[in-house]
Amino acid sequence: MEAVIKAVLTGYPGETSKKDSKKKPPATSKKDPEKTPLLPTRVNYILIIGVLVLCEVTGVRADVHLLEQPGNLWITWASRTGQTDFCLSTQSATSPFQTCLIGIPSPISEGDFKGYVSDNCTTLEPHRLVSRGIPGGPENSTTLTYQKVSCLLLKLNVSLLDEPSELQLLGSQSLPNITNITRIPSVAGGCIGFTPYDSPAGVYGWDRREVTHILLTDPGNNPFFDKASNSSKPFTVVTADRHNLFMGSEYCGAYGYRFWEMYNCSQMRQNWSICQDVWGRGPPENWCTSTGGTWVNQSKEFNETEPFSFTVNCTGSNLGNVSGCCGEPITILPPEAWVDSTQGSFTKPKALPPAIFLICGDRAWQGIPSRPVGGPCYLGKLTMLAPNHTDILKILANSSRTGIRRKRSVSHLDDTCSDEVQLWGPTARIFASILAPGVAAAQALKEIERLACWSVKQANLTTSLLGDLLDDVTSIRHAVLQNRAAIDFLLLAHGHGCEDVAGMCCFNLSDHSESIQKKFQLMKEHVNKIGVDSDPIGSWLRGLFGGIGEWAVHLLKGLLLGLVVILLLVVCLPCLLQIVCGNIRKMINNSISYHTEYKKLQKAYGQPESRIV
């Protein structure tokens, strides 16, 4: 039965008869068996019918389990990584997706972890420039970032249902060096490591495959090994794939100043020595000097001048023997930077706050995997290797600009404006131009306003229509790219390369979205060029005097109005005075002439002059 089912699924039975084995394969069958289609060939259709009949007769039912759909892959990508751009790279069939993201260190604050940790990390042991085990050292101390990071990771209390997805990065940025003990960058000294023991895990080295091999093949050195089930509990080696590029002070940052410590080194067996929990070949003094320390016999005094003058007295008697190493710790990371991954908080995968990732060289997780081992790692964020066009525009828009030109106070046309254009005919234009030029000019301005209203409404309808079409084209484009990416992924995962499917490696999809967006924006800006200048005097004053306030504009308008009134009075007052004087003179002349005529009439009729009223 199993052989029949295998033959149905693969097209090759489990065992071949001798008669069939003597047959030569056809000349056209030169493909790799791994690339054989999963569906049966035409010859096996009879076997399919036989299996179906057999299942119906025996009552065997094949239940179909519908898996819950996880949602859109790219929406999940964007929400988890905080990125809207990505690229696909068909580098290998085993990992066809390669992101264009890189890791960058980010300052860590307890406010970012609100709701994700069980307690705060306010009381952290400071890192002294000279340890308390060395008498006479200065009371200078600082808190490096790794102490806060390790404390927060140990207090994570939000568990994940599944292991966090791993992201393959192009790389990650190294941490800055500590060049001034009094001004340490906020992300300096943020590297941590994960060890299944209470001591530093320098014994594992940094090779991911080597660490995995040791933990899987040597149960004695594997703290995750369960003797009852004779198997190891699942663990995750978080060391970078290209570990030689992401290790040591080149990646975690170098301490520009020596952090003096005193620790014991002794020779345990032939050609093997141990210094502070780290084993190595050779005598212990070689270990000490190779890591920047100084071998001490009984006592030695060191005079330091950086970052300030002080004296360090390293005494071997403090170690309980007559010799030791005085200087930097010999591990790549300080002992406090190693997090014990056997603690209860790491038995299950833990969630990190949004947009915060565990970055380990060229690998990243949006969470802490269960039982992590290796390093070095730090908490940071992901970004594109180069900013895209949208990010560049945002940066330029938010940058400080000088000499900003203020726009005129032009208001856009209202939606309720009249767009009914009724032009006059030739006869009306001729008679209006000859008999009433003012009426013709007013009618022309009215029709121009209606034409502007019609143009704005027409342009708004056009841009709205093009915007809807552009949204449809964008959604179709995204669907095509998503389907093509899914098809390529499935083909590569099943070992089918470019030579199997025509046009697979070359997929040309024209992209004029940037040009369309620019033209679409130009259309919107072109519509906004039609407007009504409701305050021409204020606009003229703003353009004349630059960026003045509104109160100054109103003041200048008042002064300008008063000046215009004064000018009008100066121009018109002589005329008014002349007219008034002329009228007065005319009245006087009329009165004198009337009196003269009256006297003549009196003389003519001989009436006495005294009776004149």
Swiss-Prot record:
Q: Which residues form the signal peptide?
A: 1-62
Chain spans, region Fusion peptide? 425-445
Q: Which Pfam families match?
A: Avian_gp85, TLV_coat
In this chain, the stretch annotated as Disordered covers 14-36
Name the GO terms of the biological process aspect: fusion of virus membrane with host plasma membrane; symbiont entry into host cell; virion attachment to host cell
Which cysteines bridge via disulfide bonds? 87-506, 121-151, 191-252, 265-275, 360-377, 417-453, 498-505
Q: TM spans, by residue?
A: 560-580
In residue numbers, the region (Binding to host receptor) covers 184-233, 268-294
What GO CC terms are in its UniProt record? host cell plasma membrane; membrane; virion membrane
Topological domains, Extracellular: 63-559, 581-613
Give the site residues for Cleavage: 408-409
Keywords assigned by UniProt, alphabetized: Disulfide bond, Fusion of virus membrane with host cell membrane, Fusion of virus membrane with host membrane, Glycoprotein, Host cell membrane, Host membrane, Host-virus interaction, Lipoprotein, Membrane, Palmitate, Signal, Transmembrane, Transmembrane helix, Viral attachment to host cell, Viral penetration into host cytoplasm, Virion, Virus entry into host cell
- Which residues are covalently lipidated (S-palmitoyl cysteine)? 572, 575
User: Would the keyword 4Fe-4S be found if you checked this record's keyword annotation?
Assistant: no
- Ranges for the region named Immunosuppression are 481-497
Annotated glycosylation sites: 120, 140, 157, 177, 230, 264, 271, 297, 303, 313, 321, 388, 398, 460, 508, 589
Per the record, the similarity remark reads: Belongs to the Alpharetroviruses envelope glycoprotein family.
Query: This protein is called what?
Result: Envelope glycoprotein gp95
Report the gene name.
Answer: env
